[in-house]
């Protein structure tokens, strides 16, 4: 199923690397301690050229919409998604550059990618943690925003008040420490007039394993 009002996927869409710039020094990074062992980091304007990359991905990615079963009922997920289980042949060379920069900075090899497409403010993601891609006690999960700004909420898994971030196009949100064990996050519904947003979740097959290789 294609996105509302979007063109169907087209293959082999690339833009020049020099149209995309990364802040490899992470100079704007601001880290917030969520508790004694969990943190979240916002890196404003980590990627420049995000709108051009957004347009490329909207056309090139084979977006799909899936059903999910909850409480014995079948629901259509309120967003489109895509997964690339390998970055060896990346959809876009800029994504390989981004994965390399993240690996150098955070010391984690990011080798696959999960993408969410929020077509407008009606699309959302409910409260969850990344339990399948983050099986170790401590993981580092970078999420890059392209397109419209949307609220990104986090709250303790055991219950409590939420904190809100609002990443804009090119901003990076990074969850670290025990965030995927002890906290949950979501992108709530908003005004329908809000534009298209893509989130790129950089994932690591190493973090998806329960214990490190010996």
What positions do the PLM features span?
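Non-heme Fe(II) oxygenase metal-center motifs and adjacent flexible, charged/small-residue loops
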Residues: 1-214
């Amino acid at each position: 199923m294609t996105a509302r009002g979007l063109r169907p996927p087209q293959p082999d869409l690339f833009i020049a690397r020099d149209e995309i710039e990364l802040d490899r020094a992470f100079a704007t990074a601001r880290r917030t301690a969520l508790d004694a062992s969990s943190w979240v980091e916002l890196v404003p304007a980590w990627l420049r050229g995000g709108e051009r990359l957004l347009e490329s991905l909207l056309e090139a990615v084979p977006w799909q919409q899936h059903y999910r079963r909850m409480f014995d009922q079948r629901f259509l997920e309120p967003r489109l998604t895509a997964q690339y289980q390998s970055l060896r042949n990346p959809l876009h060379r800029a994504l390989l550059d981004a994965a390399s920069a993240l690996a150098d900075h955070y010391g984690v090899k990011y080798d696959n990618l999960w993408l969410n497409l929020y077509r407008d403010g009606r699309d959302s993601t409910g409260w969850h943690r990344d339990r399948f891609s983050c099986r170790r006690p401590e993981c580092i999960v970078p999420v890059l925003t392209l397109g419209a700004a949307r609220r990104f909420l986090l709250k303790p898994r055991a219950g409590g008040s939420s904190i809100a971030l609002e990443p804009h196009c090119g901003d990076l949100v990074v969850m670290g420490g025990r965030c995927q064990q002890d906290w949950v996050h979501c992108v709530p519904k908003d005004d329908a007039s809000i534009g298209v947003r893509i989130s790129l979740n950089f994932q690591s097959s190493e973090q998806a394993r329960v214990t490190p290789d010996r």
